[in-house]
Amino acid sequence: ADCLNEGDWCADWSGPSCCGEMWCSCPGFGKCRCKK
């Protein structure tokens, strides 16, 4: 997959980015997930 789906774990500093208009949300402790 070239992009990550909603709810997928992500890293705002590397790796594939979130699909479409979603962004990598990091609520804390480095645990980031794609959100719309």
Curated annotation (Swiss-Prot):
Disulfide bond sites: C3-C19, C10-C24, C18-C34, C26-C32
Tissues of expression: Expressed by the venom gland.
InterPro entries: Beta/delta-agatoxin_fam
Single GO term (MF): sodium channel inhibitor activity
GO biological process: envenomation resulting in negative regulation of voltage-gated sodium channel activity in another organism
Cellular compartments annotated: Secreted
Keywords: Disulfide bond, Ion channel impairing toxin, Knottin, Neurotoxin, Secreted, Toxin, Voltage-gated sodium channel impairing toxin
A Pfam family: Toxin_7
GO CC term, one of those recorded: extracellular region
Protein's job: Binds at site 4 of sodium channels (Nav) and inhibits the fast inactivation of cockroach channels. This toxin is active only on insects. Has a potent activity against S.litura larvae.
Family recorded in the similarity comment: Belongs to the neurotoxin 07 (Beta/delta-agtx) family.
Domain notes: The presence of a 'disulfide through disulfide knot' structurally defines this protein as a knottin.
Entry protein name: Delta-amaurobitoxin-Pl1c
Organism: Pireneitega luctuosa
